């Protein structure tokens, strides 16, 4: 990555704010999102810098929360060298040792979409990603860029899960994971296993962090992120291992 600071690398970029809209995580609050100008085509260095500032990727868009009077969304990341799996996580790794993994470009694959659609219909029928569609999937998870990857998890050829991940110069960014919702595979905890796999990927690549997106104390759906210890939190400018005070 460039020796320039993240702020120096991004100061000439254009950003836009969305109008206030209902928060997907805290139903009693409104949210506003800061987006990088969609006309910008950020290279690796700019994306690296924005990730250090708490930005995430969704399809072609780089964004972060920018809500008036609310700082509940906190960017979190795992320091790879200091991470030691818990006993339950070690057992999970052993339980999934029979899975085959393969990394692919973040292109559209019909087999992936079919699994994604099953996952959304089964696990998130009450969310804003329902109903699934080809257009929604392409917009969300495909991107023709060298840093964007899809990791497949297969059992004897059967596709069980896919993790969308980005390769940063200073880490791996876990974008989204979807998996087979069948009860037969529940004990595999494929969502957790996908994160453990990305931690090991970062270790092999010599990348110091795995970025998990945002953590919200009041949101139970995000509580799993604190199962990965230690965890670093972005307090606005600095990454620290103490949870910041938020409103």
From Swiss-Prot:
Protein name: Aspartate/glutamate leucyltransferase
Localization of this protein: Cytoplasm
Similarity remark: Belongs to the R-transferase family. Bpt subfamily.
This protein's encoding gene: bpt
EC number(s) per entry: 2.3.2.29
Ion transport recorded as keyword: no
A biological process from GO: ubiquitin-dependent protein catabolic process via the N-end rule pathway
GO cellular component, one term: cytoplasm
Pfam family for this entry, one: ATE_C
Assigned keywords, A-Z: Acyltransferase, Cytoplasm, Transferase
Task performed by this protein: Functions in the N-end rule pathway of protein degradation where it conjugates Leu from its aminoacyl-tRNA to the N-termini of proteins containing an N-terminal aspartate or glutamate.
Enzyme class label: transferase
Top-level division of the source organism's lineage: Bacteria
PANTHER family assigned: ARGININE-TRNA-PROTEIN TRANSFERASE 1, ARGINYL-TRNA--PROTEIN TRANSFERASE 1
Reactions catalysed according to its record: N-terminal L-glutamyl-[protein] + L-leucyl-tRNA(Leu) = N-terminal L-leucyl-L-glutamyl-[protein] + tRNA(Leu) + H(+); N-terminal L-aspartyl-[protein] + L-leucyl-tRNA(Leu) = N-terminal L-leucyl-L-aspartyl-[protein] + tRNA(Leu) + H(+)
A GO MF label: leucyl-tRNA--protein transferase activity
């Amino acid at each position: 990555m460039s020796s320039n600071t993240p702020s120096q690398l991004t100061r000439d970029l254009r950003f836009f704010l969305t109008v206030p809209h209902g928060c997907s995580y805290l139903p009693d609050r409104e949210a506003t999102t800061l987006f990088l100008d969609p006309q910008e085509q950020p290279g690796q260095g700019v994306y690296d810098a924005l990730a250090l500032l708490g930005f995430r990727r969704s399809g072609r868009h780089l964004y972060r929360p920018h809500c008036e009077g609310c700082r509940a969304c906190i960017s979190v990341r795992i320091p790879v060298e200091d991470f030691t799996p818990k006993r339950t996580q070690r057992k999970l790794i052993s339980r999934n040792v029979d899975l085959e993994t393969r990394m692919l470009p973040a292109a559209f694959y019909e087999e992936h979409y079919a699994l994604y659609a099953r996952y959304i219909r089964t696990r998130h029928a009450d969310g804003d990603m329902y109903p699934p569609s080809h257009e929604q999937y392409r917009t969300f998870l495909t991107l023709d860029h060298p840093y964007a990857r899809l990791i497949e998890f297969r059992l004897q050829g059967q596709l069980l899960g896919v993790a969308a991940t980005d390769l940063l110069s200073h880490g791996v960014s876990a974008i989204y994971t979807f998996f087979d919702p069948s009860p037969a595979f529940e004990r595999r905890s494929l969502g957790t296993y996908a994160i453990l796999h990305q931690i090991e990927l970062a270790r092999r690549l010599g990348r110091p962090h795995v970025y998990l997106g945002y953590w919200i104390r009041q949101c139970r759906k995000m509580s799993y992120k604190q199962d990965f210890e230690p965890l670093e939190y972005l307090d606005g400018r600095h990454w620290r291992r103490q949870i910041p005070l938020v409103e």
